[in-house]
């Protein structure tokens, strides 16, 4: 998957930078979005390039769950949810919506 595009979605710029720096060093190409609305926009513009989405749950404008629902209407692209919330109910909810990890 080296050289593949990964969409990193997080409202915290430090987290996006950390992920971008780490993944870029591994040879991945990174697309970024700072909120859910921008994530949908970037996804729709680059759906044929993106191979993986790293998606924060708690974001302004549109939360990660809503973004995941929208993406699942159009794609089975792998999605890994990123969250500081470690509650089991959140994890189960994510799997019900189709998250991969």
Predicted regions: what they are:
Residues 1-7:
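Non-catalytic signal-transmission and effector/linker regions of two-component phosphorelay proteins
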Residues 7, 32-52:
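Acidic, metal-coordinating helix/loop segments flanking the phosphotransfer/catalytic sites
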Residues 17-25:
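Charged docking surfaces used in two-component/phosphorelay signaling
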Residues 35-38, 63-66, 90:
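Acidic catalytic/metal-coordinating carboxylates
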Residues 44-48, 70-77, 97:
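Conserved phosphotransfer cores of two-component systems
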Residues 56, 83:
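Active-site residues of response regulator receiver
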Residues 59:
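Receiver (REC) domain active-site loop signature in two-component systems and cognate sites
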């Amino acid at each position: 998957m080296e050289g593949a595009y990964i969409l990193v979605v997080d409202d915290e710029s430090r987290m996006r930078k950390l992920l971008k720096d780490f993944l870029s060093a591994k040879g991945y190409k990174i697309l970024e979005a700072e909120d859910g609305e921008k994530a949908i926009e970037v996804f729709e513009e680059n759906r044929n390039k993106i191979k993986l989405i790293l998606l924060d749950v708690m974001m302004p404008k549109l939360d990660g769950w809503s973004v995941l629902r929208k993406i699942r209407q159009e794609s089975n692209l792998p999605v890994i949810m990123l969250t500081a919330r470690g509650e089991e109910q959140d994890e189960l909810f994510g799997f019900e919506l189709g998250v991969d990890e």
